[in-house]
Each structure stands twice: as structure tokens, then as C-alpha cells.
Amino acid sequence: MSEQLKVSSSPHIRSKETTGNIMLWVIIALLPATFFGIYNFRDTHAWLLVIVTTAAAVLTEYIYEKLMHKKITIKDFSAAVTGLLLALNLPPTAPIWMGIIGSVFAILVVKQLFGGLGQNFMNPALGARCFLLISFTGRMTSFVYDGVSGATPLATIRANIEAGNAALDGVNSMHMLIGNIAGTIGETSVIAI
């Protein structure tokens, strides 16, 4: 056994795909959920929230790397993916400033302070969502419009089981499939996801 193991950080498998190409494919994959979420809520605010949150993530990464004299990596689109994922995790009624705060937290605290892309301890967008949920619980959980208000499907199923009824009584599967339910911008339509 004269072989020596080479110990190094990931990635251990390499390909000719660049990070930028992979991130572009992720953005393309997120577009159906993004467009449907904006259409579903029929609101220019949702569109503005997606644009500003994504731009804030990219700008935060650029400013941080410029100030720290690091290589500028915004061309790898990872910050854009983080901003878009965060925007899709926000309620359509979230104020614009909340998207900006979330983007700054995601990029600075969760991503860059732990070494940048691939070194972060958790997904930056989900870390920012948790931060926003803890910091602004009311705004992060009050996203139900009048047209889609009511019990969540899981609450309806639970109530049906407790009452001894069929579990799916009162749960409209078609509404869940097409996205006519309450939720964040990117989570309502099973088809789009």
C-alpha cells in the first residue's frame, strides 16, 4: 500500500462545467416558479421584490469583495442565485427593505464570512429566510390574500382526521396543483416547481 491519500477540500470530482454555467442553469430552472409566482399574485410588488432582492445580493457580494480586496466573483452568478432563491422564499407582501436586509445577511454573514462559495455552513438564502423569520415574524407569516385565505391543506387534513372524516375532505387538489393557495412567491405551484 504505497498509495498516499491526498486530503483536500471539495470538490473531489471535477468536470469542464464552470460554476457560472451551473448557476445559469439553476436560474433558468427557477424561472417557471418565479414567473408563475409573479403571475399568481398579480402584483408588480412581487416582481419588484424579486428584482431588488437579487440585485441587492449581487451588489452586496461585489461591495464586500471590493472592500476586502478579493477577486470579484459576481460573474459566477452564485449571488444572483442566492438573491433569487431568497426572493422566492419571501411572502409577496414583504416590504422591499426586507428583501435587501435578507440579501445582505445571506451574502455577508452566511456566505462571505465563512469563506465564500462552497465554504458556507448552510444555504445562504435559507439562512437569510430563517434570520428574517426570527427578526420579522409577523411580516414573514402574514402573506394570505383574501382570495386565497383559509386553513392550510395540512390543517384541513388534520382537522378532518380528528373529526373522523376522510382526510382529504375539503382539500382542493387542483388549487394546490395550479398554485391557487397561500404561500411565498416561489412555493405555490407544484407544476411550476
Predicted regions and their residues:
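N-terminal signal-anchor module of multipass membrane proteins
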Residues: M1-T54, V58, E65
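Membrane-interface helix-loop-helix junctions at boundaries between adjacent transmembrane segments
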Residues: S78-A79, L84-A151
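A glycine-rich, acidic short-motif signal
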Residues: V50-L84
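Structural signature of hydrophobic alpha-helical transmembrane segments
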Residues: D43-A56, T93-G102, I181-V190
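Long hydrophobic alpha-helical segments that form multi-pass transmembrane helix bundles
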Residues: G118-I193
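Short, amphipathic, aromatic/basic-enriched membrane-interface segments that mark the entry/exit
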Residues: R14-M23, E65-K75, T93-A94, I178-G186
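C-terminal ends of transmembrane helices
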Residues: S10, L59-K71, I107-G118, I193
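Hydrophobic, membrane-inserted alpha-helices
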Residues: A29-T34, A57, E61, A79-A87, ...
